[in-house]
């Protein structure tokens, strides 16, 4: 379960947004300045119309020293060291195509470019599209042996220009762009058998991707997963489409709910060098380790260590036990050989393995060692070095902070992102550690621009000779290019200076990032504070909540969103709090909600609101809460708790009963809804059981009728329970909208409607 995608924007330094990271409440722009400030505020229209547009710099590395960047619809090739560019593909080249190009992908050898058009979105990551291949040497389209329309996924091999694609749930390989395709699988069937692509639950909850294809580093082998959903129950819902449609369409998706039959999975590998168009290709299955065969299991990661060594991670349905199985190719038999010494077990005794799944391994170039993020004995996620045939590993990082991700591995260094700097869980910085001396660690971003940039991500060139640093806040996004040998900044790629100048004329809110201590534990929060914030005044407070396991809402990212409008124009404080169950602060906090969803994370939001109301600047008669998805669930549970703290709240696309949500996500945290396992906590964590307490609050319930993720059923049952209890409440549905309610008209309508509700609740004009 994830929150709907929202545009993330930022502001330069103190000119547009002030971020305070401190323990005591800090006074900002106090008092008398407000009357003299004639600048306009950031309005709801500004948010809905995206009046202030941030610039991004999305490059694509094509080698260790060159990258592509699209500018004025020309695709330019840049040299990283010197910054000079040449036209890789002119805008005029696209004029000869019959279709509008949605995206492109260049073959690793630079000879061909794959052009995508007719894009049709399916679920969160999945889509279908049509493709043409352009020969860059001949400067012409390849017209023979074209890729079929409505292709579900396509990818180049890591070297050369082989192609693997999925069409009608079957896998195909092209060894040359202009040659005929080799059909690899023959079993594909809609809503039943998926080859090379994920079914709904694997796409949403395990791979976070549609692809289930994995090329070996040189393209000799192709691994692919097969999912069998024939026993998975279908979710069915109406899709109303145009008003001229007399009978609505019925959408059907194999969707395993908690405790229901899951898809089964198999993993195959095929050698692509010897494909013969006259004979069917032979795929070799790699079966799971014996420890997985005692019950249901998931395939959760596939990583190639080298050309003839593959790592598979398998996870039991009760997600506290996983096995990483490293297999080697036997040339004489064509089989992938297992060894007990090359099986690595990862377990959790306090919750589940990993943050959402076991982390992927990062292998050394010889494939003999790998680095992986796992929990240490203190429950913090850190990097451990493994030898492939040894059970124990050596931690190379440590501390009361967490490694977020391994970003690059070279002969001498490992690069990673962590939140170590200044003990702030909501920050992100880039570090490198010397592999022959783990005590030699350097932060490459911490002191570059600490006022503007405290939240970084990174993109490395093919062999990590260069990297792009991407600063997401608290100031405006800043993109810089660096040389790895000395970490020197070579140039600024984008600094959003034009936007900063525009925002000088707007009264922008400030952001406070701080913590409170509850039961001797630090819990972080953020507040978006109105312009000219004055601690002697009383402001209405809106809690913006998500609160799902391993979530984080208090961070150093700058956003231009609905909260910006509420603070700037309506003088509402918008706060978020990371309580028990939240992520990136150790397993003790994250696993507190294990098998207990709907308890501590709900209680902590209520307690946070109480603590905020004691700070002196919150009007305790005007406190509201709102959230989307898991946040909608927590909002509803909070309002149904009868605490007397909240006047009103908004729940968008909420879960209402955990048996209604998908198996992978729900069972990770709750186990199975059976009397032998955790049925009592399933029953005690429903919104409907709290219906009577909604008489004490004002409640707005919102859902899209075509939500494939959190089904409309969830809100329908809340509505039914409230009606049965005689509760007066407001509700809004959005016809044919999915979980994001993101189409243009619906997006504008929902935020306008919610704004009216909040203003009415707070008695604002």
From Swiss-Prot:
Residues exposed to the Cytoplasmic side: 1-6
UniProt GO MF annotations: aminopeptidase activity; dipeptidyl-peptidase activity; protease binding; protein homodimerization activity; serine-type endopeptidase activity; signaling receptor binding
Pfam families hit by this protein: DPPIV_N, DPPIV_rep, Peptidase_S9
UniProt xrefs under SUPFAM superfamilies: alpha/beta-Hydrolases, DPP6 N-terminal domain-like
Cell compartments where the protein resides: Cell membrane; Apical cell membrane; Cell projection, Invadopodium membrane; Cell projection, Lamellipodium membrane
Any single biological process term in GO: negative regulation of extracellular matrix disassembly
Keyword field contains Transmembrane: yes
Domain of life of the native organism: Eukaryota
Residues carrying a glycan: 84, 91, 149, 178, 228, 280, 320, 330-331, 519, 684
Keywords, sorted A to Z: Aminopeptidase, Cell adhesion, Cell junction, Cell membrane, Cell projection, Disulfide bond, Glycoprotein, Hydrolase, Membrane, Protease, Receptor, Secreted, Serine protease, Signal-anchor, Transmembrane, Transmembrane helix
Oligomer status and interactors: Monomer. Homodimer. Heterodimer with Seprase (FAP). Requires homodimerization for optimal dipeptidyl peptidase activity and T-cell costimulation. Found in a membrane raft complex, at least composed of BCL10, CARD11, DPP4 and IKBKB. Associates with collagen. Interacts with PTPRC; the interaction is enhanced in an interleukin-12-dependent manner in activated lymphocytes. Interacts (extracellular domain) with ADA; does not inhibit its dipeptidyl peptidase activity. Interacts with CAV1 (via the N-terminus); the interaction is direct.
Function recorded in the entry: Cell surface glycoprotein receptor involved in the costimulatory signal essential for T-cell receptor (TCR)-mediated T-cell activation. Acts as a positive regulator of T-cell coactivation, by binding at least ADA, CAV1, IGF2R, and PTPRC. Its binding to CAV1 and CARD11 induces T-cell proliferation and NF-kappa-B activation in a T-cell receptor/CD3-dependent manner. Its interaction with ADA also regulates lymphocyte-epithelial cell adhesion.
Family: Belongs to the peptidase S9B family. DPPIV subfamily.
Record protein name field: Dipeptidyl peptidase 4
């Amino acid at each position: 379960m994830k929150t709907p995608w929202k545009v993330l924007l930022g502001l330069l330094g103190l000119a547009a947004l002030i971020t305070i990271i401190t323990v005591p409440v800090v006074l900002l722009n106090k008092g008398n300045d407000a009357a003299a400030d004639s600048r306009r505020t950031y309005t709801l229209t500004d948010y809905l119309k995206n009046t202030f547009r941030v610039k991004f710099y999305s490059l694509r590395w094509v080698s260790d020293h060159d990258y592509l960047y699209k500018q004025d619809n020309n695709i330019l090739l840049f040299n990283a060291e010197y910054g000079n560019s040449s036209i890789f593909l002119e805008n005029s080249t696209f004029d000869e195509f019959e279709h509008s190009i949605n995206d492109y992908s260049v073959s690793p050898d630079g000879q061909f470019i794959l052009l995508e058009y007719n894009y049709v979105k399916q679920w969160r990551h999945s889509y279908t599209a049509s493709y043409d291949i352009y020969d860059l040497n001949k400067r012409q389209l390849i017209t023979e042996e074209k890729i079929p329309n409505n292709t579900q996924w396509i990818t180049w091999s890591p070297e050369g220009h082989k192609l693997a694609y999925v069409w009608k749930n079957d896998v195909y390989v092209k060894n040359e762009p202009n040659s005929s395709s080799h059909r690899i699988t023959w079993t594909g069937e809609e809503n039943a058998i998926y080859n090379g692509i994920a079914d709904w639950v694997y796409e949403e909850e395990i791979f976070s991707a549609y692809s289930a294809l994995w090329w070996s580093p040189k393209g000799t082998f192709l691994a692919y997963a097969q999912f069998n959903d024939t026993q998975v129950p279908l979710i069915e819902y109406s899709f109303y489409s145009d008003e001229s449609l007399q009978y609505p369409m019925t959408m059907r998706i194999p969707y395993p709910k908690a405790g229901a039959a899951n898809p089964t999975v198999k993993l195959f590998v095929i050698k692509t060098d010897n494909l013969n168009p006259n004979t069917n290709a032979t795929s070799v299955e790699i079966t799971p380790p014996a420890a997985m065969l005692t019950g249901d299991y998931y395939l959760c990661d596939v990583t190639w260590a080298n050309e003839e060594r593959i790592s598979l991670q398998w996870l039991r349905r009760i997600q506290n036990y996983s096995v990483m199985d490293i297999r080697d190719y036997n040339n004489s038999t064509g089989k992938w050989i297992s060894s007990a010494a090359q099986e690595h077990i990862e377990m959790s005794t306090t919750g589940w393995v990993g943050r959402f799944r076991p982390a992927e391994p990062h292998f050394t170039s010889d494939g003999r060692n790998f680095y992986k993020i796992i929990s240490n004995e203190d429950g913090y996620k850190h990097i451990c070095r493994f030898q492939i045939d040894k059970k124990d590993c050596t931690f190379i990082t440590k501390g009361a902070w967490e490694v977020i991700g391994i970003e690059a591995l070279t002969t001498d260094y490992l690069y990673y992102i962590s939140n170590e700097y200044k003990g702030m869980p909501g920050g992100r910085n880039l570090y490198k550690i010397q592999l022959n001396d783990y005590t030699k660690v350097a932060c490459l971003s911490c002191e570059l621009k600490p006022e503007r940039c405290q939240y970084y991500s990174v993109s490395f060139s093919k062999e990590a000779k260069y990297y792009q640093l991407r600063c997401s806040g608290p100031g405006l996004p800043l993109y810089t290019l660096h040389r790895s040998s000395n970490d020197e900044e070579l140039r600024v790629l984008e600094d959003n200076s034009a936007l900063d100048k525009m925002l000088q004329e707007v009264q922008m809110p400030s952001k406070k990032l701080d913590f409170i201590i509850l039961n001797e534990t630090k819990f972080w929060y953020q507040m978006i504070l109105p312009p000219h914030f004055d601690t002697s005044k009383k402001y209405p407070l809106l809690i913006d909540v998500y609160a799902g396991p391993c979530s984080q809402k208090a961070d150093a990212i700058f956003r231009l969103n609905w909260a910006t409008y509420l603070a700037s124009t309506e003088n509402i404080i918008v706060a978020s709090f990371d309580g028990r169950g939240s992520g990136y602060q150790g397993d003790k906090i994250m696993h507190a909600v294990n098998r207990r969803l709907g308890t501590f994370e709900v209680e902590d939001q209520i307690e946070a609101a109480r603590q905020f109301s004691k700070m002196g600047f919150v009007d305790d008669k005007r406190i509201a809460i709102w959230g989307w998805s898991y946040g909608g669930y927590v909002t509803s549970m909070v309002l149904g708790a009868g605490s007397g703290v909240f006047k009103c709240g908004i729940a968008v696309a909420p879960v209402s009963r955990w048996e209604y949500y998908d198996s992978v996500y729900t069972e990770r945290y709750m186990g199975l809804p059976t009397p032998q396992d955790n049925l009592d906590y399933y029953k005690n964590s429903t919104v409907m059981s709290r219906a009577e307490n909604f008489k004490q609050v004002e409640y707005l319930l919102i859902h899209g009728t075509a939500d494939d993720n959190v089904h409309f059923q969830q809100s329908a049952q809340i509505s039914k329970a409230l009606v049965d209890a005689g509760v007066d409440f407001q509700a809004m549905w959005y016809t044919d909208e999915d979980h994001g309610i993101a189409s243009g008209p619906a997006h504008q309508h929902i935020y306008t409607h919610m704004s009216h509700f909040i203003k009415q609740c707070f008695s604002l004009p």
